[in-house]
Amino acid sequence: PIDRKGTKCLKYDFAVERGMPADILPLWVADMDFQTSSYIQDAIVETASHGIFGYSESDDAYFEALQGWMRRRHQFEIEKKWVVKTPGIVLALAMAVKAYTKCGDGVLLQSPVYYPFSEVIRDNGRRVISNDLVLGEDNRYHIDFVDFEDKIVRENIKLFLLCNPHNPVGRVW
């Protein structure tokens, strides 16, 4: 890990003014405390060095990398036309909620979960239906599949939002 204090880092340098204790240990998911890979740093420098910052598009190499990863990791073939890029997870969640449900529909999630999941559902006029994760004797969270199936049938669920890896419980499903 690297010391991010004094780098205008939101989770450390602005904790007190956001009402947090000065000695808080922030355990954020998407704000890492380790240095970015040199390959990524080099690619950023190379891209920035031409000095033009207009809109860009992904080329075939981008899609081929995604396809290769899905093939190696999940033995699953994806098509380029299936890939929809978004600037962030919250917008992607909102797009899915709007595309696959109607106002008043129930959308299933698994609590506890990253709070924007439920906000996006409510903000779009849908109902939050929770299949609560269960903390087992092994001190790991598990899915209650009986409740999961019951909620899908009883609430006529049209969409299930899976958080994977799960935030905040840390499970990879």
Regions found by a protein language model. Give the residues of each.
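N-terminal small-domain helix-loop-helix segment of the aminotransferase-like
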Residues: 2-88, 95
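Conserved core of the PLP fold type I
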Residues: 53-173
